[in-house]
Design a protein with these regions (language model features):
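Noncatalytic regulatory segments and standalone regulatory/sensor domains
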Residues: 1-2, 122-214, 220
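Canonical tetratricopeptide repeat
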Residues: 224, 257, 291-292, 326-329
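Active-site-adjacent substructure of cysteine-protease-like catalytic cores
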Residues: 76, 81-132
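Canonical positions in the second alpha-helix
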Residues: 211, 243-244, 277-279, 312-313
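Structural marker of alpha-solenoid helical repeat scaffolds
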Residues: 214, 247, 281-282, 316
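TPR/TPR-like (Sel1-like) alpha-helical repeat modules
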Residues: 280, 298-321
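Active-site-adjacent structural segments surrounding the nucleophilic cysteine of cysteine proteases
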Residues: 1-63, 108, 125, 185-194, ...
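Residue-level recognition of tetratricopeptide repeat
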Residues: 218, 251, 285-286, 320
């Protein structure tokens, strides 16, 4: 029960509401029209045609994730302007206060690399950030997930604090962005990911190299280029992973990718070190990293540590298809 006779409580409540956006309840989504894009578009009273997304999705028949650039381009075709930037917590708050719901790229749950989330507001009194939740409550009202600002910013930093703005041109023109010059470089990263999904590796590499030419400090571009080179078993991937980490020493995926490269090349000490740094940044982000580290530790005769890693793997990924094999390995170690 709120005590409305307490003026400070009432002031804090009103101040909190000033920083929250009322977003539409949306359930429809498609790999080419991801939920965050659909929510923000409907917020601006623009209904993106699902039929268009379904038709586009036919070329990605065997892909399970979301293709953000397809949704972004659909929104742009229907009148919205998009900016993709590396941002900050203070800038995110300014964007919300202008009335724009930002989309941020955050770490995924185990076995989902990343996910996009719509931020619906913040509360500086409680030091929380509000995430849009897909389903409303029983009364059909908007629900929000609250996360402490410090934890949000810590997790957001793992992928370079990427932020997507979708808004009408007259609204977008009213704000001055901190890293607007890097916008084209960031867009090329999203385009390159689509090209990779389409198995067009050469064009994807070209897009990433151009992205780095435009912004040599684009950690996302450096990571993606390193990943493609890693897939080709090229030693060149190491320098790009290292450049990415130098720019953002909390870039989880870069440590994990570098660890994978060293694992493939049987450089177990280096691999273990990279995995350890990734786990130190976020111990719950990936289950597979524990299985990989268990493998190399078993090779190094570190059976007790390998056993603990396999237990962590199953704890984070209880429905793993190889659960039976892993449990047997744990018993044998």
């Amino acid at each position: 029960m709120i005590d409305f006779n307490n003026s400070q409580i009432l002031f804090d409540l009103m101040d909190s509401l000033d920083h929250q956006l009322l977003l539409p309840l949306v359930e429809e989504e498609n790999i080419c029209l991801p939920l965050p894009i659909n929510v923000v578009s409907k917020y601006w009273n623009i209904d993106l045609p699902m039929s268009e997304a379904i038709e586009t999705a036919k070329q990605y028949a065997n892909y399970n994730g979301s293709i953000l650039i397809e949704g972004i381009e659909s929104a742009e075709r229907h009148g919205l302007i998009c900016k993709i930037i590396h941002s900050s917590l203070s800038e995110l708050k300014k964007i919300i206060d202008i009335g724009i719901p930002p989309i941020v790229i955050l770490p995924g749950i185990p076995e989902i690399t990343q996910h996009a989330s719509v931020i619906s507001g913040y509360d500086d009194n409680e030091k929380t950030i509000f995430h849009y939740i897909q389903k409303g409550n029983q009364e059909g009202e908007q629900q929000e997930g609250a996360i402490p600002q410090a934890i949000f910013d810590k997790e957001w930093s793992e992928d370079g604090r990427l932020l997507i703005i979708l808004a009408p041109s007259n609204v977008l023109s009213s704000i001055k962005l901190e890293n607007n010059p890097s916008e084209r470089s960031n867009r090329l990263c999203f385009i390159s990911e689509r090209l990779s999904i389409q198995k067009n590796t050469s064009e994807s590499l070209s897009s990433l190299k151009k992205a780095i030419e435009l912004d040599q400090n684009n950690s996302a571009a450096l990571y993606l280029l390193a990943s493609l080179l890693n897939e080709q078993n090229s030693n060149d991937c190491v320098q790009y992973y290292e450049k990415c980490i130098k720019i953002n020493n909390r870039f989880y995926l870069a440590y994990n990718g570098l660890g994978n490269y060293y694992l493939k090349s049987n450089q177990f000490d280096k691999s273990e070190s990279c995995y350890g740094k990734a786990i130190e940044i976020n111990p719950k982000r990936s289950a597979k990293i524990y299985k990989n580290r268990a493998y190399l530790r078993e090779k190094q005769k570190k059976n007790s540590e390998a056993k603990n890693d396999l237990k962590s793997y199953l704890k984070l990924f209880p429905k793993a298809k190889d659960r039976g094999i892993i449990e047997q390995t744990i018993r044998e170690l």
